[in-house]
Amino acid sequence: MKWEVVIGLEVHAQLSTQSKIFSGASTAFGAAPNTQACAVDIALPGVLPVMNRVAMEKAVRFGLAIGATVNPVSIFARKNYFYPDLPKGYQISQFEKPIVEGGQIAIRVGETERRINLTRAHLEEDAGKSLHEEFEGSTGIDLNRAGTPLLEIVSEPEMRSAAEAVAYARALHGLVTWLGICDGNMQEGSFRVDANVSVRPEGQAEFGTRREIKNLNSFRFLEQAINYEVQWQIDLIEDGGKVQQATVLFDPATGETRAMRSKEDAHDYRYFPDPDLLPLTVTEADFAAVRADMPELPGEMAARFVESFGVPELDAAQLTQSLDVARYFEAAAAASGQGKLAANWITGELAARLNREDMALAACPIAPERLAGLLVRIADNTVSSKLARQVFDALWDSELSADAVIERDGLKQVSDAGAIEKLVDDAIAGNPKAVEEFRAGKEKALNALAGQVMKASKGKANPAQVQDILRQKLAG
């Protein structure tokens, strides 16, 4: 039997605010346990929540960016459940009337591009954190995180593979960081993914029973967890078993999921409107202020890169996955006048070096204007593409310009026809077998001769001229 995979994601994005959603306590990460939890956060009797309007503005920004309906009036509700790190015994969330409804996220898997519909995005408070490993035989509770503003972003169950789910999560991560509403730090829990996974026979309209994989904090774990869970469900059903709705955890050490508890439905949480909070209103002035502060969106910028710099669509999409990368590219392309070359170097050599150094682009020692200087010299044939990598390495390790490095290290490309012709004559005279093979129709023999010329010139000869002169000489 052929099976179809059905995946929907719930993403919890911590909003980048200075204070918590219903109190003035700090949201800074890394403070000593329980030093950033005020009376509201720990639910002392008599305290009342006060809405942080900055969190509302960030939710509105997200809604506008995805083409969603942003409700002018939304309602906070109490989600009732007991857990040690939830002091009130309920979580303030949104249920029947969220701030954002609908919208779409564009994803690309290979050459295929499609759009994933969103169900909703709602504001809520984060819970505290249970610390199991630090205390032998007991559990510690850190309430610093309690009350941190979250935007829970819920997709429709439209993804059909782990690859699509990862593409969606990456696109969403890129968007919330682009918009400046979330720092996206998955290691610190700023962007956490829950995956609802089920399988059904191909062609069946009814969904299978889903299991929810909780708190995945890397794209690699998301892919591994979904792939394992899909195969586990298929094996269970084919062996005559039945999938039970459950919440499961993924163990990175074993690559397996394991059931944590039976999965609750909405009625289990006994939602009702929070009597301590007025309906959240977004005024026309609020909408206008958010629109005025909206950055150019990734899709819009990618289209402009194609139009203004002649960059291929795939490269433009890659360059606009991060606002930092997009801005770096635009500065380098504008300064050099070499859009395609800038795209190739930024997505190739620069990205590889940053990856090797485990470094963010913000810490890159080569400013876009310095890279532009190198691109200009590649374009005007002052330096060959091969020797340009040596120049790039020197730029990384120094504050010199590309021109200064080329001059200092004698890397200027030899484009003098007479000088190259002499090197070609020497290569032909010294490699009669390669000459004979080329004239017999073996094209690869020409590359061997060109390699000898490049070796003799220490990589400085203009490769295109070398090829042209070789062909002229060997045709005679």
From Swiss-Prot:
Pfam families with a match to the protein in the record: GatB_N, GatB_Yqey
Q: Which UniProt keywords apply?
A: ATP-binding, Ligase, Nucleotide-binding, Protein biosynthesis
The organism's place on the tree of life at top rank? Bacteria
Any GO MF annotation of the entry: ATP binding
Keyword Lyase assigned: no
The protein's matches in InterPro entries, at most eight in alphabetical order, are given as: Asn/Gln-tRNA_amidoTrfase_suB/E (IPR017959), Asn/Gln-tRNA_Trfase_suB/E_cat (IPR006075), Asn/Gln_amidotransferase (IPR018027), Asn/Gln_tRNA_amidoTrase-B-like (IPR003789), GatB (IPR004413), GatB_C_1 (IPR042114), GatB_Yqey_C_2 (IPR023168), Gln-tRNA_amidoTrfase_suB_CS (IPR017958)
Q: Which reactions does this protein catalyse? A: L-glutamyl-tRNA(Gln) + L-glutamine + ATP + H2O = L-glutaminyl-tRNA(Gln) + L-glutamate + ADP + phosphate + H(+); L-aspartyl-tRNA(Asn) + L-glutamine + ATP + H2O = L-asparaginyl-tRNA(Asn) + L-glutamate + ADP + phosphate + 2 H(+)
Oligomer status and interactors = Heterotrimer of A, B and C subunits.
- Family, per the entry? Belongs to the GatB/GatE family. GatB subfamily.
Q: By its UniProt entry, which PANTHER family does this protein fall under?
A: GLUTAMYL-TRNA GLN AMIDOTRANSFERASE SUBUNIT B MITOCHONDRIAL AND PROKARYOTIC PET112-RELATED, GLUTAMYL-TRNA(GLN) AMIDOTRANSFERASE SUBUNIT B, MITOCHONDRIAL
Q: What is this protein called?
A: Aspartyl/glutamyl-tRNA(Asn/Gln) amidotransferase subunit B
Q: Which organism is it from?
A: Laribacter hongkongensis (strain HLHK9)
Gene for this protein? gatB
